[in-house]
Every structure is written in C-alpha cells, then in structure tokens.
Amino acid sequence: RSIGSDFVTSTLMSYVVRANYNYASKYYLTATARYDGSSKFAEGKRWGLFPSFSAAWNIAEENFMKEQDVLSQLKLRLGYGLVGNQNIDDFAFYTLYDAKLEDGKVTYVPKGRRGTKDITWESQRQFNVGVDMGFLNGRITASLDAFLIKNKDLLMTRSLPLTSGFSSAVENIGAIENKGIEFSMNAKLIETR
C-alpha cells in the first residue's frame, strides 16, 4: 500500500531594469537586464543575470535622405540578448521518495528520478542584424533579418542505467545553434479614404 501526499509549488522572482535613449529620432539605444531567481534550482544556482542590448539608426531621418523620394523608411538594427530557461519540474535537484507501508513498516523507495544539485539555468544567446525599408510613403514595407541563436546548458532529462537504482536525471547537457535569414514584405495594394 502506498502512502502519499503532494504539494508542489515553485517561485520565480525577477528584477528588471531598462534604459532607452533616442537622439533626434535618428539614433536609438536600449539596454535591459533581468536578474531572475527560481526555486527550481538548488541554493547557489538559483539566480541568473540576463542582459540585452539593441541599437538602431533611422537613416531615413538623415539630411542626406531628405531629397530622395524612393525610400520612406530605412532603418538599420543590431541586437544582442541573453535569455534564461527554467522549464523543468519542481525539485529536480532533489531525489524524491515514495513512502510504502508493508506489514506495518514504512519504507521509502526512490520515485525514479535522481536529484541533480548542480543543475542551473539554460541560457540562450541571440544575435540579430536587420534592416527595415519602406517605399511609396509606407505602402510597401520590407524587413530583412539575419540571426544567430546559441543555446547552452540545455535542461534535459537523461536516462540512467537501471542498475543505478534510478531511471532518469535532469541535467544541463548539450548545446544547439540556430542561424538563418528572414525576409518579410507587406503591401497596402488598395487604400480607400
């Protein structure tokens, strides 16, 4: 016979600071920082700092662009950011046990997952370079972006040999890199007033 009760809760606490700067609607700077703490990680591994920065140059507002009538918008963008992931079960850093009652005695057996005290935040670094363009007073717009995304310390469940007494453990294993180019275009073909 099994004895059991469950009460599972986790907490995420965040501190966020952001600064924006705009000079003459031509030059833009943004800096953001998040300091996140999650109860899903063991003491000493709970907090992660995740900054991001971006800059843009609105070339269409420059004096040398005033005389032309082809481009109604031209903006160059550059961005970098670090994002954290804590998408794991609560208490993955603990080895959890079930209580069993047999012949009047209570015994404890592992639930199957081995706790991992040193798991920490999975992190994703994002780099982006882009350009926004507008033609015919904004009736046609286009954006071109090149990006590079690198994930490291992936939070994954690893199978363990049954001889260990456990079936799995959550660990920071692996890395993924994703890169590409995106293009989008919009048009207002018919405009009524």
Task: State the predicted function of each range.
Residues 1-193:
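Extracellular/periplasmic, surface-exposed regions of secreted and cell-surface proteins
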